[in-house]
Amino acid sequence: LPQQPVLPILFERLMMKNVTGYLHSVETAGALDGPGIRRVLFLNGCPLNCVYCHNPDTRKYKGGTKTDAFTELRAIARQKEMLLSMKGGVTLSGGEPLWQPAFVKAIFEGSKMMGLHTALDTSGFLGKKADDELLSFTDLVLLDIKHFDPDAYKRVTGVDLQPTLDFAERLSALKKPVWMRFVLVPGYTDDMDSISRMAAYAKDLGNVERVEVLPFHKMGEYKWEAMEMDYALFDIQEPEPDLVTMAKSRFEDEGMVVF
């Protein structure tokens, strides 16, 4: 463990509290989920049923490996110097990490005590589970908004859009930095009117530092087949570059920084 006296005290407290969680996998040097090089923990459990989900194996809450915050913080501590030197930190993703809010809070609290940047990758649907203390340990929220039309959102995800918007507005009120993410799926999320309204909404929030337009890909298709699940997007191809450019331009028209 690192030598700072506060860390063993924190870890001992976590051991006593026995904060457990279910983990799907860990990426030790991620470069896509927040600034710098990051340790990314993918948590199990998700209430959404996104038709284009590339990690359907994370949906089941207890489908992953049971772990505890003490164990995971020890692993983070071993990477601390590298993460700091690469201007990175720790990202919790999923699945939907807010299905395990106590675990998220413990990991982020420990990470902040090590001086590490923290990022939460979430759909926002369970935003009410993120209390103010959890958000105080969160430096950045990667907010995935799947669609801006409520009916289309429900068709794509199986759940309502409003909880995500409520969470977005709460983050705005807190002035919590947000990177908004939007997956562009031909025939499902490519309605330019809806994208324009999403772009205007992102601008009005005032705390969205950047927007990432992520082209749909088929890399998770084999997981659906392996799990014998019906994959609705089997015949859907990845979006053409012109479509991606058009979607990005709607955000750029609102003055947003777009990737």
Model-predicted regions and their roles:
Residues 10-30, 186-259:
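Auxiliary Fe-S-binding modules of radical SAM enzymes
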Residues 66, 158-161, 238-241:
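Short, conserved loop/turn and helix-capping segments at secondary-structure boundaries
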